[in-house]
């Protein structure tokens, strides 16, 4: 009996742990995912009744607005996002770039230049159960893969969605903080609008000024603030239903929607621009999926978010149906007097939490754009030791702050900001609907009827709301359009210039026949050390190498062509990150190393990179020797042959490592350097503490009698070169359009791309290359 109970308890333990983790993630999601969505009741009714709908302020119109809010909130956030879209995650990640990444992997739609077949062998590349032989609409796949213009249009649609999400990062803090602060005017009736705007700006500046500290120190407060806020507004809504108008439940009938449009006509259609604000923030359910699970996000929405917000909208409608004149400040007027100030404080905190979540999402979007080659290089700071992916981008932070304060000061009106906010949110939602339809066809391999039904059902609703928002372009709706145009231009010009640069490198790479004709010395003096040549090419030798050796006919004894590239997956496992291969015969001592990162990976300043590189090359040499022993000699060229080097490889590292931090070893490692270079390095290390604190190691060959002498010689040459020192060689490229190019190309390359390249961070900075070891080779490209 006890044994059976023990077995049963053991079986139940994983289930208990699973549900405990699910509840914990659902609780934490309130502070990250739902902050923006939960603050919508602050301004929905005010924005809806701000225009021509003022002429229809009566109980029946309020019932019609509530019916629209209820069915819109049920159809889009609940049915579309919670039920369907959350299932389209990219290995746990969400957002427009996650959908685009899925499409690029399951159909050849990507513009990433240096992709190779080895990338498709990544464990997270394809969706489980996917097979290209059973795809639906093969003609559509072939059409999009064949026609560059179709793929360009798809990219522009994704960039439009990303630009609008960046616009959300500007508009959400402005409307949320200003709405919460406007509650002061309910009790302090003599307070001027300028004072409310000033207080809002102070809060906004403080919010952005604290971004560099990260959110981990106060993140534990986010979830309880939002939960308290939700229970507050849910309880207030229930109180208002009972106290003011218990018949308000009748408004849930679609009959009142029909009656609403019969009464208001075109004015009611224009008022939809205010009603759509009830679902702003639901895109965050999908975009911020990475830190949670779809099950936890669904659980939080269904059990708490949906009922609390519906109760609040119903309660506010019940209050307004009996207090029509209080429409401009309906939310705060509906709060019972004794709890006004506590609710005001919680509302302000909830607005800050909602703004924080959107700002963090904006940083993530910019990082993804950069990883996919669609945004200039910016500084990315990892702000959390425990939460992977929590980042801070200083340049973007200050741009957002300036634009957010400018919008707040310029408009000073929640309605005008709401008009702009609605355009941005509905555009992002429609982009998601469009991409989801393609996901159903290319990734889920569903029937065309299923995908078309999804697109027509949700797309038609979103188009109606979007058209209503666009009617208010002159009343603030122009702001997100202008912002999106600016950000899209920056993204596409950078993408265009980067692609042209890669195409030039690809067309002008050095042939292997020429390299082999030079012999093992490469027709230059080979000096001790390792030369790391950065290139975007994954095959061949870049022309920067011949350009360098032509002007300075000397190079290092060991050459490594290093390519750091992005692949269209969110994360690359460390065990799959490194691809190592050989260029030319063994005597040439030339290797290729490809380091792969996902679009959500953060490239940290890893002081162990050089050591990892040497270890991986050593592993490759041993693997190649094992393969060659069972086949032909590998003294011949092996160009194009790459191997994935993993930390858990069956081949143990042939190199022994020991710390070399003592003075004697340090001097031994530097013995081959000139006195002036050693002095310069010492000065540099004193000025750069991070460099001086880097771990120094010394490699040694183990005493193995059975090791092949050629392999031992090659490993010994690699170790001695590492101890001599590593030099980084990188091209400093100037790109100019050809004289016969079109006006667009000349403007994009000579003006736009040139300006962005000069004002963004240099590649050596983003790759954390020490300046003391860097050689930049000037190159001029005519594209």
UniProtKB/Swiss-Prot annotation:
Main localization is: membrane
Against InterPro entries, the record matches this protein to: K+_transporter, K_trans_C, K_trans_N
Alphabetically list the UniProt keywords.
Cell membrane, Ion transport, Membrane, Potassium, Potassium transport, Sodium, Sodium transport, Transmembrane, Transmembrane helix, Transport
Which residues are listed as membrane-spanning?
A: 22-42, 62-82, 153-173, 190-210, 218-238, 269-289, 299-319, 339-359, 391-411, 423-443, 448-468, 476-496
Give its localization: Cell membrane
- What is this enzyme's catalytic activity, as reactions? K(+)(in) = K(+)(out); Na(+)(in) = Na(+)(out)
Topology check: give the Cytoplasmic ranges. Answer: 1-21, 83-152, 211-217, 290-298, 360-390, 444-447, 497-783
A biological process (GO) of this protein is: potassium ion transport
Could you tell me which residues belong to the region Disordered?
662-691
Q: Name one GO cellular component term.
A: membrane
Stretches in topological domain Extracellular: 43-61, 174-189, 239-268, 320-338, 412-422, 469-475
Its record classes its membrane topology as: Multi-pass membrane protein
What spans are recorded as compositionally biased (Polar residues)? 677-691
Its Gene Ontology molecular function terms? Answer: potassium ion transmembrane transporter activity; sodium ion transmembrane transporter activity
Family label: Belongs to the HAK/KUP transporter (TC 2.A.72.3) family.
Q: What does this protein do?
A: High-affinity potassium transporter. Can transport sodium under high sodium and low potassium concentrations in the extracellular environment.
Spell out the protein name for this chain. Answer: Probable potassium transporter 2
Gene symbol here is HAK2
């Amino acid at each position: 009996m006890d044994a059976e109970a023990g077995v049963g308890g053991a079986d139940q333990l994983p289930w208990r742990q699973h549900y405990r983790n699910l509840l914990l993630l659902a609780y934490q999601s309130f502070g990250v995912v739902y902050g923006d969505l939960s603050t919508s009741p602050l301004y929905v009714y005010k924005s809806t009744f701000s225009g021509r709908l003022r002429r229809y302020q009566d109980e029946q119109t309020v019932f019609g607005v509530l019916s629209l809010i209820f069915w819109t909130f049920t159809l889009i956030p609940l049915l579309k996002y919670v039920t369907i879209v959350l299932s389209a995650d990219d290995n746990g990640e969400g957002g427009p770039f996650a959908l685009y990444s899925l499409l690029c992997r399951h159909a050849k739609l990507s513009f990433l230049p240096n992709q190779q077949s080895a990338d498709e062998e990544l464990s997270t590349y394809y969706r489980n159960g996917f097979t290209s032989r059973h795809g639906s609409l093969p003609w559509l796949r072939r059409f999009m893969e064949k026609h560059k213009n179709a793929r360009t249009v798809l990219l522009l649609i994704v960039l439009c969605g990303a630009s609008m999400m960046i616009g959300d990062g500007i508009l959400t803090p402005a409307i949320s903080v200003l709405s919460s602060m406007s509650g002061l005017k309910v009790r302090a009736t003599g307070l001027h609008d300028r004072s409310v705007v000033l207080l809002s700006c102070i809060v906004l500046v403080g919010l952005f000024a604290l971004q560099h500290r990260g959110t981990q120190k106060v993140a534990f407060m986010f979830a309880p603030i939002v939960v308290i806020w939700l229970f507050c507004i849910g309880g207030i809504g229930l109180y208002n239903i009972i106290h003011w108008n218990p018949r308000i439940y009748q408004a849930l009938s679609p009959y009142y929607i029909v009656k609403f449009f019969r009464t208001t006509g075109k004015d009611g259609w224009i008022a939809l621009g205010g009603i759509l604000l009830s679902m702003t923030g639901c895109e965050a359910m999908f975009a911020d999926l990475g830190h949670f699970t779809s099950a936890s996000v669904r659980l939080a929405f269904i059990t708490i978010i949906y009922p609390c917000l519906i109760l609040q909208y119903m309660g506010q409608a019940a209050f307004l149906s009996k207090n029509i004149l209080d429409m401009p400040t309906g939310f705060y007027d509906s709060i019972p007097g004794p709890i006004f100030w506590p609710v005001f404080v919680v509302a302000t905190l909830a607005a800050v939490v909602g703004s924080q979540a959107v700002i963090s999402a904006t940083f993530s979007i910019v990082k993804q754009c950069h990883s996919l080659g669609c945004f200039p290089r910016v500084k990315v700071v990892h702000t959390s030791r425990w939460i992977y992916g929590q980042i801070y981008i200083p340049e973007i932070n200050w741009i957002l702050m300036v634009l957010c304060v400018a919008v707040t000061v310029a408009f000073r009106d929640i309605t005008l900001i709401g008009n702009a906010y609605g355009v941005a949110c509905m555009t992002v939602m429609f982009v998601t609907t469009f991409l989801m339809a393609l996901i159903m066809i290319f990734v889920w391999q569903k029937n065309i009827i299923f995908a078309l039904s999804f697109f027509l059902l949700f797309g038609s609703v979103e188009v109606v709301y979007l058209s209503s928002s666009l009617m208010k372009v002159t009343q603030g709706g122009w702001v997100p359009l202008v912002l999106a145009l600016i950000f899209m231009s920056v993204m596409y010009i950078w993408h265009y210039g980067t692609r042209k640069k890669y195409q030039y490198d690809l067309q002008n790479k050095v042939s292997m026949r020429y390299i082999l004709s030079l012999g093992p010395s490469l027709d230059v003096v080979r000096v001790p050390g390792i030369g790391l040549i950065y290139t975007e090419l994954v095959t061949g030798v870049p022309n920067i190498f011949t350009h360098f050796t032509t002007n300075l006919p000397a190079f290092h004894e060991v050459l490594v062509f290093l390519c750091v590239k992005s692949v269209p997956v969110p994360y690359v496992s460390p065990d799959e990150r490194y691809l190592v291969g050989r260029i030319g015969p063994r005597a040439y001592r030339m290797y290729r190393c490809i380091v792969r990162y996902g679009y959500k990976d953060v490239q940290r300043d890893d002081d162990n990179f050089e050591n990892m590189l040497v270890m991986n090359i050593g592993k490759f040499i041993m693997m190649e020797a094992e393969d060659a022993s069972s086949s032909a000699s590998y003294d011949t060229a092996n160009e194009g042959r790459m191997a994935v080097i993993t930390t858990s490889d069956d081949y143990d590292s042939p190199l022994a490592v020991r710390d070399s931090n003592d003075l004697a070893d340090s001097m031994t490692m530097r013995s081959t350097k000139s006195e002036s270079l050693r002095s310069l390095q010492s000065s540099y290390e004193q000025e750069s503490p991070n460099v001086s604190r880097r771990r120094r190691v010394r490699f040694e060959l183990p005493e193995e009698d059975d090791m092949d002498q050629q392999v031992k010689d090659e490993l010994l040459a690699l170790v001695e070169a590492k101890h001599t020192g590593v030099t980084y060689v990188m091209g400093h490229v100037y790109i100019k359009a050809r004289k016969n190019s079109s006006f667009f190309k000349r403007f994009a390359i000579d003006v736009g791309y040139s300006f962005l390249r000069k004002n963004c961070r240099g590649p050596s900075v983003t790759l954390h290359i020490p300046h003391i070891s860097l050689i930049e080779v000037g190159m001029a490209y005519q594209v």
